[in-house]
């Protein structure tokens, strides 16, 4: 086993354990209200879906990484896990987009008609938007999977007659195909960037105004600073995820290509990073995790 492959395997296993822990806490912290009959908000619904999606996505990605250790089974495993990886990756990015949109509509206070309309749409039709996002993720992943499998089959047939064909370039698609396959990533990225930029601008403006106010108001400034930091972390994470995803859906994964390896590692660590950001942003989830780490008890998940 090569040092690079061993490193990828260790990163994948550590990331899986960490992602499972963090996202399980997200599910426990937000899911109790769904089963207790209490009223839930839009952000909690998205958090719950993010927790489940991240765990499933991390599992299939780790399975794909482990398959590199068994070359004789890699092709079969690759065909099994490729479609789930595509679907979970797309849906996870849509969930982040709608989460950022909810943060924007909850935090900012604009009176423009367009903003009010968007806020009403998200408030009233969020479950429908999530369902539509899931269907779109499955549909585009199916098209993507078909093209990848067709390319792999053609490559294997040509390679059987001409071994020099096995070293073909890594690119899968033409530019129009890339635009179609990545359309959901592009829309999600636009929603995320727009929402976070508007939210951060609003928070920074509010913090600036609070700094010039009385000392009693300044005591609450840390809450807004923490919120702004969370938005910036989500923006950085979404940018890294977007670049890695676009590269991953358009270029064949190759252990000899450093860019390909880095992008795949970023995708593999996404569930862990997103779970960590969401937990540090929620005092309830953060205290719940710290309590469990200190004495091994899960408390506060029903509060």
Language-model segments: which ranges?
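Structural signature of the GPCR N-terminal helical module
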Residues: 11-73, 95-105, 229-240
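Extracellular-loop-to-transmembrane junctions of the mid-late helices
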Residues: 15, 139-146, 165-195
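Intracellular signaling interfaces of 7-transmembrane GPCRs
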Residues: 33-43, 108-125, 197-224, 283-303
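Membrane-interface helix-loop-helix junctions at boundaries between adjacent transmembrane segments
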Residues: 78-88, 100-130
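Fourth transmembrane helix
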Residues: 91-95, 121-154, 191
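Seventh transmembrane helix
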Residues: 94-95, 233-239, 247-256, 261-303
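Class A (rhodopsin-like) GPCR signature focused on the TM5-ICL3 interface and adjacent 7TM helical core
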Residues: 97-98, 148, 182-213
């Amino acid at each position: 086993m090569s040092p690079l492959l061993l490193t990828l395997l260790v990163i994948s296993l550590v990331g899986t354990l960490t992602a499972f822990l963090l996202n399980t806490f997200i599910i426990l912290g937000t899911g109790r209200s769904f089963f207790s009959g209490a009223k839930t908000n839009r952000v909690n619904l998205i958090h719950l879906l993010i927790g489940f999606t991240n765990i499933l996505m991390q599992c299939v990605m780790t399975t794909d990484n482990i398959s590199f250790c068994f070359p004789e089974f890699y092709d079969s495993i690759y065909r099994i896990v490729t479609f789930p990886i595509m679907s979970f990756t797309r849906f996870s990015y849509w969930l982040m987009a709608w989460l950022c949109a909810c943060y924007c509509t909850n935090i900012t206070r604009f009176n423009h008609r367009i903003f009010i309309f968007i806020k009403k749409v998200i408030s009233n039709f969020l479950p429908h938007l999530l369902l539509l996002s899931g269907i779109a993720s499955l549909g585009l992943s199916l098209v993507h999977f078909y093209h990848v499998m067709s390319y792999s089959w053609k490559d294997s047939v040509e390679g059987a007659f001409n071994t020099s064909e096995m070293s073909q370039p890594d690119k899968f698609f033409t530019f129009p195909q890339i635009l179609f396959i990545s359309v959901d990533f592009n829309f999600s990225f636009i929603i995320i960037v727009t929402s976070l930029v508007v939210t951060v601008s609003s928070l920074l403006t509010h913090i600036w105004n609070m700094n010039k106010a009385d000392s009693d108001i300044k005591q609450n400034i840390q809450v807004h600073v923490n919120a702004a930091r969370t938005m910036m972390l989500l923006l950085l994470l979404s940018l890294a995820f977007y670049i890695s995803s676009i590269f991953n859906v358009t270029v064949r994964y190759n252990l000899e290509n450093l860019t390909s390896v880095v992008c795949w590692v970023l995708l593999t660590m996404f569930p862990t990073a997103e779970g960590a950001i969401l937990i540090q942003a929620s005092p309830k989830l953060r205290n719940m995790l710290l309590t469990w780490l200190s004495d091994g008890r899960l408390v506060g998940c029903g509060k």
